[in-house]
Design a protein with these regions (language model features):
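Low-complexity, glycine/proline-biased repetitive segments and flexible coils/loops
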Residues: 1-108
Length: 108
C-alpha cells in the first residue's frame, strides 16, 4: 500500500501447555502453561495471542488484539486534502495514502 512491506490483521499465536506459537503479521505470541498470551502490535488490527493450556493449573488469559487502522489510497490527482483527525499522509509515486489510527474523516 505504501511502497514498503507492511503487515496487517495477523492472527494471534495459539496457547499450549509447553510452548505457544508466535503470531504472524503483528499478532501476539501464544501463552505457555498457565501463562498469558502476548498482545498484538498496535494499529495493525491483529489478533492477540491465545492463553496457556496447562492441564494442572488455571488456563491463562488470551492477549489483547491490536488496535485498528484505516488506510485510504487514491491517485494524487484525486486527493482533495480535506481531512479531519490526524491522518498520516504520504505520497507513493502517483498515489496519496492516508492512514488513520484514531477517529477522523476524508472528504472527496
Amino acid at each position: 500500500i505504501k511502497g514498503s512491506p507492511n503487515l496487517y490483521a495477523g492472527g494471534g499465536g495459539g496457547g499450549a501447555s509447553n510452548s505457544g506459537g508466535a503470531g504472524q503479521a503483528g499478532g501476539g505470541n501464544g501463552g505457555v502453561g498457565s501463562g498469558v498470551g502476548g498482545a498484538a502490535t498496535v494499529n495493525t488490527g491483529s489478533g492477540g495471542g491465545g492463553g496457556g493450556g496447562n492441564w494442572s493449573a488455571q488456563f491463562g488469559a488470551g492477549g489483547n488484539g491490536g488496535s485498528g487502522v484505516v488506510i485510504i489510497r487514491m491517485l494524487t490527482s484525486d486527493y482533495s486534502g480535506v481531512t479531519t483527525g490526524s491522518p498520516t499522509v504520504t505520497t507513493d509515486g502517483s498515489y496519496t495514502v492516508l492512514e488513520y489510527t484514531s477517529s477522523g474523516s476524508y472528504t472527496v
